[in-house]
Amino acid sequence: MKKFYLLVMLATFSNCSEDLSNNTPGFEALVNGKDWIAQSYNATIQNNQLSISGNNQLGTISIVIDSINVNSFELRSWSDDFAVFQDTIYYSTKNDGIGSIAFLSAGRIDINEINYFENSVSGHFYFECYDNSGLHVKNVSEGVFYRVPINTQD
């Protein structure tokens, strides 16, 4: 019976996907469908704006929102809230794509927690962004940041 119970527990836990909340803190996403895990990350509050950034050898993801609240924010070319992916090229939700059909940058960030006791921020995000020409696009999906440290600069 003990072996059966052990097998059931092993099968249960082997099917669980990795949860970033167990890896305090962290910042990761899929960029064009490939894993992107930040080696360094931080958040900054300045002039009532929240900036969250992560970077690794493949590039930098930055998100800026004009609020310091737990809420959802749309990332669009006409919005004050925006996201950037930068490798050798600068991609932004402030840029729209061009073509026979207008391709618009779009995305969303959900701030799930601002922990003032630990001075950290957690949430999820996704966005599609274009380079300055509007011809090249990056798709950033399944983004999550967990307990990213906040630096306050007022």
Q: Where are the model-predicted features located?
A:
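Positively charged n-region of N-terminal signal peptides that target proteins for export
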Residues: 1-4, 18
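Sec-dependent N-terminal signal peptides
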Residues: 4-13
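Bacterial Sec-dependent N-terminal signal peptides
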Residues: 13-37, 154
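Surface-exposed helix/loop patches within compact recognition domains
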Residues: 27, 44-120
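Short acidic, glycine-rich loop/turn motifs
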Residues: 29-33, 54-56, 127-133
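Well-ordered beta-strand positions in beta-sheet-rich domains
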Residues: 35, 62, 108, 137-146
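C-terminal or internal capping secondary-structure element at the end of a domain, subdomain, or sheet
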Residues: 114-154
